[in-house]
Swiss-Prot record:
Secreted lipase that is able to hydrolyze both the neutral triacylglycerols and the monopalmitate ester Tween 40, allowing the use of hydrolyzed products as carbon sources. Has broad lipolytic activity, which may be important for colonization and subsequent infection, therefore contributing to the persistence and virulence in human tissue. My be important for alimentary tract colonization, but not oral infection. Facilitates invasive disease via lipid-based suppression of the IL-17 response. GO terms for molecular function: triacylglycerol lipase activity. Induction: Expression is not induced in medium containing Tween 40 as the sole source of carbon. Expression is up-regulated during the yeast-to-hyphal transition. Expressed in alimentary tract but not oral tissue, during mouse oral infection. The gene is LIP2. Keywords: Disulfide bond, Glycoprotein, Hydrolase, Lipid degradation, Lipid metabolism, Secreted, Signal, Virulence. It comes from the Eukaryota. It catalyses: a triacylglycerol + H2O = a diacylglycerol + a fatty acid + H(+). It holds the Pfam family LIP. It comes from Candida albicans (strain SC5314 / ATCC MYA-2876) (Yeast). GO terms for biological process: lipid catabolic process. This is Lipase 2. The lineage of its organism: Eukaryota, Fungi, Dikarya, Ascomycota, Saccharomycotina. Its EC number is 3.1.1.3.
């Protein structure tokens, strides 16, 4: 039995080694057409069916449709760009409800983009996207359309808040114009959701919306942010020298992709021995970089990569780019106008809870209309990904159902966010969704759970290999 389980666990890796899907960097679809600069932000520049089936933890999922859209947007400086967003239609979809899910891509290479990593047959390097896809399955089971944008944009600007938030909003604009092929209503309700790196994009989208996309306020019913990345400097301080140290070179390269002068400055300050791993951070996806560089010290310790230590980040060229990307550094103009849920583990080992606390207090002091903080006393960053998901799903369901959100601010602590109100159905949906994805059940409401298709789940994986 153990041998069978081991073999089944290897099947996704075996399949990925046998199939080749075109990386984003080699796919012309990602390149905007001539003259795209004149298009409006949120316009659809290109459209195609997903080149391959989508997968959840490397098992192909059965959905009615999946499209890729190339969407017009702009970078942090107002320069036009274009990014890909993936739109998924479940069976028996409700055209009035869409979840915009921002993945924790956390990488500075376009070949780590969710539009590529979510495809069946994507390489093992994109495993974090495949894990993240397990969170997309429950909304699909509920009949919600799901859109997941490559919010880091064509330059893969991990940790760059404005680019990430704007792309998230332009993705929403695009899908609200997609009715001719997707069936989505122009006045559809949209819930934003993201965890960890995805919370950075989601939080910035909620903050930028009143200024960047004011017309979307009538559509966006709320934003759920978990493992809330409000302060990127504090995250670097938290992970330097720990098993998660590889996050640092990913984030620094992401910032440097948006600020070219920053990359030159980083290399001038790097110790010679650290240059190869800094370059690797520009190529690796999240899991690979974490695996290769645990316990490395970049700003602390006697053999740190940057001799100046944390003092380096106080120098003008570094400090400005970092300050530009601190959500907590925005002024009151960017107070979210939609309900917000923050869910976070008290003992989060990557994103210290003091920073989500500070962001919560700031927004409350500014008079936010609805802000709920669900603190989980028992979990760290990784565990809260999954124990907090049912709370986010229950909260999103309530927003779609038109239930009145928290008025003003509310901060609650629980032993676990699995005890969040009305999570029994969403917890069941989450774990049943994993089961159904593995065994190939079509995703959508009113679907017979025994209706397994040969092209999806475990059977689809085996048949593809055979």
């Amino acid at each position: 039995m153990k041998g069978l389980v081991f073999l089944l666990g290897l099947l996704p890796t075996i399949y990925a080694s046998l199939v080749h899907i075109t990386p984003a960097s080699e796919d012309d679809f990602y390149n905007p057409p001539a003259g795209f600069e004149s298009a409006k932000n949120g316009d659809i520049l290109k459209l195609r069916n997903s080149p391959n089936r989508l997968a959840s933890f490397y098992f192909p999922i059965d959905v009615k449709n999946a499209w890729q859209l190339l969407v017009k947007s702009e970078d942090s400086f107002g320069n036009p760009n274009a990014f890909v967003t993936t739109l998924i239609e479940p069976y028996n979809a409700d055209p009035s409800k869409v979840v915009s899910y921002q993945t924790w891509e956390d990488a500075s290479n376009i070949n780590c983009s969710p539009s590529y990593g979510a495809q069946f047959g994507s390489p093992l390097s994109t495993i974090t996207t495949q894990i993240d896809m397990t969170l997309i399955v429950p909304p699909l089971r509920s009949g919600y359309y799901v859109v997941t944008p490559d919010y880091e944009g064509p330059k893969a600007t991990f940790a760059v808040g404005r680019q990430s938030g704007q792309a998230t909003l332009d993705s929403v604009r695009a899908i609200l114009k997609s009715g001719s092929f997707s069936g989505i209503n122009e006045d559809a309700k949209v819930a934003l959701w993201g965890y960890s790196g995805g919370s950075l994009a989601t939080g910035w989208a909620a903050a930028l919306q009143p200024v960047y996309a004011p017309e979307l306020q009538k559509n966006i019913v709320g934003a759920a942010v978990g493992g809330f990345a409000a302060n990127i400097t504090a995250i670097a301080e938290s992970v330097d020298g720990t098993i998660f140290a590889g996050l640092i070179t990913l984030a620094l390269n992401g910032l440097a992709n948006e600020y070219p002068d920053l990359k030159t400055a980083f290399y001038e300050e790097l110790s010679d021995f650290a240059v190869p791993e800094f370059k690797a951070g520009a190529e690796n996806c999240l899991a690979e970089n974490i695996f290769h560089y645990p316990l490395h010290q970049y700003f602390t310790g006697p053999k740190r990569a940057f001799e100046k230590g944390w003092g380096l980040l106080k120098e003008d060229i570094f400090n400005k780019s970092i300050q530009d990307n601190l959500l907590i550094g925005l002024n009151k103009t960017y107070l979210p106008q939609v309900p917000v849920l923050i869910y976070h583990g008290t003992v989060d080992e990557i994103i210290p809870i003091k920073d989500p606390h500070a962001q919560y207090q700031l927004w409350c002091d500014w008079g936010i209309e609805s802000l709920e903080f669900a603190e989980d006393l028992s979990t760290g960053h990784l565990a809260e990904t999954f124990t907090g998901a049912p709370a986010a799903l229950a909260w999103i369901d309530a927003r779609f159902d038109g239930k009145t959100p928290i008025q003003g601010c509310s901060h609650t602590t629980r032993l676990t966010n699995l005890l969040y109100p009305n999570t029994s159905d969403s917890t069941h949906s989450y774990f049943l969704g994993i089961y159904q994805a593995v065994f190939g059940t079509p995703l959508g409401p009113g679907i017979n759970g025994d209706n397994i298709t040969i092209n999806s789940g475990l059977l689809g994986l085996v048949s593809s290999i055979i």
